[in-house]
Structure formats: structure tokens, C-alpha cells
Amino acid sequence: MLLDTDAILKKHDIITIKLFSGEELVGKFEEETNEVIKIKMPLTLVASQQGIGLQQYLFTTDPRKALPIQKSALVTVTKTVKNYADAYEQQTSSIIKAPAGLADALKAN
């Protein structure tokens, strides 16, 4: 497994994992041991007519539980780029983020 050397992972960082099976997962980093990386609420990338989307990785488990992924199954691990991290947060959170600049626009009124 290759770990992006610029990616010092902290608990709750949104990370991307590429598996040897070809699947790409996005989830919240929980912890790492010698054998596994645990991620919470993993989603997988899916292609659609509207572009790339995110869907639940495992449908028959509690998505809030940290899922151990064997390091032997990993190709690489890195922090997720902002636009996909934002999409992940929006899909997994009940909090709706305000658009950028909204606070400044409200202050001006």
C-alpha cells in the first residue's frame, strides 16, 4: 500500500482509498493499525449520466460504524480533494452548509 507522503491523516479527515479490486472509497479516517485502516461511513464512487456520484459502500451494515479495511487490500490512501470532500460531507451530514460568501452578503444588507 502506498500512503501519500503529504497526507498526514488525522481522525475525521475525509480520505480516499483505492482498493486492489478497483473500487474507490471515500470516508472519514478513524484509526490505523499495522493491519487495517478504519474508516467511518464509507461511500464508493459511481458513474451516472450526471457525472460521478457517491453511494453507500455496504448496504447491509450500520454506515455509522467504523469499517476496518485490510491494508493488504489497499493500493493507496490519500486525503480527498475539496470538491469530493464537500460532496461527501453534504451526503453524510444532516447539516446544510451555506454557500461561500453568504455571510458577507448578509452583512452588506
Please give the residue ranges for each predicted region.
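Conserved RNA-binding domains used in RNP assembly and mRNA/RNA metabolism
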Residues: 2-109
